[in-house]
Amino acid sequence: MPGPMTLTGRYVTLAPLGAADVPALDAANRVSDAIWDYLPYGPFPDRAAYAAWVASVANRPDPRFYTLTPAGAEGPMGVASLMRVFPEHGTIEVGHICLAPALQRTRAASEMIYLFADWVFTAGYRRFERKSGAPNPPSPRGGQRVRLALPR
């Protein structure tokens, strides 16, 4: 099972989600309510509601949430999780990807997938999954950008 860990790449650092991340994430996420369109939560009416959501998910083992902080940024600009963890089947999925508009379609966002995939396979899992749905057009394009193409 993935635990609290920090993964650092050239363009982004992934770290466990916690209460200290709320101000930066809330500010980054207020730019566009559209980032919540395909998630089962959000947008949040105020920082207190966002903080309550973070408190409710921050220490869960599955899904395990991480922040994404681009190199040079003052704070995190997105979250993602490792979820649907089945060690007995050797599978794990990345999901709950919520990126501020400034982080979307960047090297940092692409590297997030690489860092998670590298950890997953190094930890001995055999399958790394990423949900992608037709109702969310940016999702398949994001998968193609990191060579996680849809099956034909």
Which stretches of residues belong to each language-model region?
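Conserved GNAT acetyl-CoA-binding A-motif
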Residues: 122-132
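GNAT-family acyltransferases
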Residues: 1-106, 119-123
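Conserved beta-strand-loop-alpha-helix junction that forms the acyl-donor binding cleft
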Residues: 130-140
